[in-house]
Amino acid sequence: MIGTWHAIVETKIAKLKITFSIKDTNGEYSISAVVESFPVALDFDHVTVEGSGLRASGRAKSLQEGEAYLELIFSQNKFTGTLNIPTFGTLSLAGERGPGTSLTDLLEQELDQYRMTGVVERTEESIAAAVEQLLGQLSLQEKVGQMSQCLASDFSFGEEVASEPPEKLVAEGKAGSILGAFDINRVLELQRIAVEQSPHNIPLFFNADVIHGHQTIFPVPLAWSCSWDTEGIQRACAIAAKEASSAGITYNHGPMVDITRDPRWGRVVEGAGEDPYLGARIAEAQVRGFQGNSLFDQDTIIACLKHFIAYGAAEGGRDYNTVDISEGTLRNVHLPPFQAGIQAGAGSVMNAFNIYQGVPAAGSKFLMKDLLRNELGFDGILLSDYGAIEEISIHGCAEDEAEAARMALDATMDIEMVTRAFANQLPKLIGEGIVKEEQLDEAVRRILTYKYRIGIMDDPFRYIRPKKALECQFSEEHLQESRALARKSIVLLKNDGVLPLNASSGTVALIGPFARSKDLLGTWQFSRHGNATVTLEQGVTEAVSGRRVFIADGCAVDQPIDGGYEAALQVAEEADVIVLALGESSRMSGEAASRMNITLPEVQLKLAEEIAKLGKPTVLVLTNGRPLILDWFDRHVNAIVETWFLGSQAGHAIADVLFGQYNPSGKLTMSFPRHAGQIPVYYNHFNTGRPASQEKHFSSKYLDGSNDPLYPFGFGLSYTTFDYSEIKLDKHVLKRADSLTVQVTVANTGQAQGEEIVQLYIQDICGSVVRPVKELKGFEKVCLSPGESREIHFIITEEDLKYYAADLTFKAEAGDFKIYVGPNSRDVQEVSFRLE
């Protein structure tokens, strides 16, 4: 049994190749193991050999960490046995002597027979002709099949769905797209069935939620929105698309572009915050990143804007809850990011789970057909969210599945995600004359058009590139891009001079459940490299001598640890500076992760209180997916660093900021409330007839606290200071065909180089309906050395002043306006002008 052995194992998650190296050193056996295609670190420290059998135990690290157990029986040049490891469970092994061929090479060999050369991008005229020719050949069942999506395996993203095996559905032409094919081998397997066994050999879309990275994980979208760096966000999305497409993924279930004002809602972590203008700019950047210049490019994936529309307005911040807003709010607040994404060329849109005017979005003709398609001109693929069509009847807006399917089709829904309402009901509805086959033709026409546009109709296997995947996924280049964007996403909320820390002197105590945690990636990521996440401990110890860093967890995220507080206090006593690493676990934000109480868990608050009693310089480093209530911390710690979930390079990025290797420049895209009773609190609220006043009792205010947030939209500190000159306008009356130039000079008045995000807001003083007190209309990020100043210019035109007015027409109304410029939405200068 001495030597190298290998086995190939099929699992629900991925195909694995496990290579064992067995050695005998003076009668002591040892085993090392390498797992290919999925990073699993195996360390066997206890090996027992009896005859032709071997038993070993040790530790394994993959998506989870835990015990590993191995049993092998050898017979000449072959072996059988079992391996039990976290994430995968018990695997049956059957292998042979030798290292064998790598899975990448085996897959490339399989693909050789399918590789095509000379395939060129079709013209739109050629695509249209090909689509019509193919559409005329399809049976009703095949058309419904193109409109139906199934899961790649029995792994489920939500409630279990009764369905036939994907292999059968694909072979019979009953599925046109696949969700959740996380393994490149599975992509090949199902695509081969589609093009070799289905009636007209139509290849499949392979869909996945690539929200903030594929294998290299970037900051969660709420975090990267705080960078205000649209170019950096676009690069991150392009990298995510490159990694995903190399593994055969062609269709993304992102970006999420919902406007979010209620931090209780868990899915704020997936969006760009509370502002429509910034949300629109970031939506554009994400679409361009994912889709590139051409969807025919193999390094791109189809972008899907979600969730249309107003999902972020769920009452009480409770996921899937009722939405009850005016059409003016719908258009002025929630529509701009979708409109911008569509103008940027997004190929797909996904419906929201909520109702609008009493009708679930998935079945709303007004939302999907009248507004999205007819008014906004969207001609791409409309994809239902998971179970949304069946849920029309659960809402109580359809009597049964048949009526729900009819409503969704009438609303121009093209693809049903995973559930089977279309498959079960559309043939019968057509037979009864309730819906027309021409409606199916419209949907299938859109689907096939995109299958031609991405090139799979001419080269079905063009995206399956195992060598490319091996080369680019989690590459050093991509990790450096992740680190760069992570640094820009960090927001310094408070600093009384304790930061930056000195990397060459003094001692640091890292205390808290996130001191050495790898739970820094956030929700909606499926990276196989989670175990390689850079922790805060790693980042800090690389920045300074490891001898000067003391570490104690103190408590778990939401549970005490025996002796945890005592150990933390002992460590804190030994240090010059304390870094409190507190926050939420990744499961505490995201889908179905709403919270009533958005403070830190009680065990962490108690830990912080005990540490604060020591009176030592204390820095709070937050890991979280939403704005939190930080009023106590603002009063009791010296510095607060909001890091969100920063991704694969989180620890390095945080250390870069803590020790001054990078001057923080992030600005909040959601307001932080002082108290949960303020929620929702956002900067661009309407005025009232009785604005808040301390002098007037009968005004719109609380008796027991301020109306204002603790940290407003656009807020973020730096290690330097910036001074703003008075605002200058080139004119004070703006004619409709003209433009107005706003000028302000920003100077770095501190001692460090820094970046400032200069923000411009407008206020329409009087409209046909009440307008917000401020609206962001421009921003510019500028990097200044100490003593350096720069003139910043913004151009305002009539277009910037338009909104959906009382009659719901999009227009700018003549009258007086104010312009505000400053470092955030609160601390601004103002000047007036008039539109005529």
Show the residue positions of the predicted features.
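A cross-taxa feature marking solvent-exposed loop/turn segments within ectodomains of secreted
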Residues: 13-15, 40, 65, 88-90, ...
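A glycine-anchored, Pro-Gly-centered beta-turn/N-cap motif
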Residues: 1-4, 808, 813-815
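Glycoside hydrolase catalytic-domain context in secreted enzymes
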Residues: 103-802, 811-825, 834-836
